[in-house]
Amino acid sequence: MKRLGIDIGSTTIKSAVVDEEGSIIWSTYERHQSKINLKLSGLVHEIRDKFPLDKEMIVAFSGSAGMGMAESLSVPFVQEVYATRTAVREREKDCDVVIELGGEDAKILFLTGGVEVRMNGSCAGGTGAFIDQMAQLMGITPTVM
């Protein structure tokens, strides 16, 4: 059965459909401009048109605005750090560090020896300030990152 993941963040809505083998067969990325319900409705129609023969998909939401949507639709919510960690471990076995820049925050995940997550202050979210902070923390230059 195919799986559909929808990440609704503070500024964008992303989605991906994954086939039975775990390959991404379709994805989207667009700004929602605070019109989350409208964008989600359009996205659902687009998915239905793209996959008309797939009567069922496993669906989950993530993202800062995804929790409320998942709750209102009775769909599972997956915390985005967990989703990122799972995907990276499956697809990039040698990866040690993941930097995720979002619209309202930024995170760095250290994967070796378990998982350690660090997050910047919201005021620098989605900016290069976080990269500078993390480079300093790791004792390297931003260029090396």
Q: Can you say where each PLM-predicted feature lies in the sequence?
A:
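Short glycine-aspartate micro-motif
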Residues: 3-7, 58-60, 94-99
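Short glycine-rich, Thr/Ser-proximal phosphate-binding strand/loop in the N-terminal lobe
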Residues: 3-38, 42, 116-117, 121
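A short acidic Gly-Thr/Ser loop motif
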Residues: 7-11, 63-64, 101-105, 127
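Short beta-strand-loop/turn "lid" adjacent to the catalytic site in phosphate-handling enzymes
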Residues: 29-32, 48-82, 109-118
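Glycine-rich phosphate-binding loop plus the immediately following alpha-helix
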Residues: 35, 113-145
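Alpha-helix C-terminal capping segments
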Residues: 71, 88-93, 110-113, 137-138
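Active-site cofactor/substrate anionic-group-binding motifs, chiefly glycine-
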Residues: 80-99
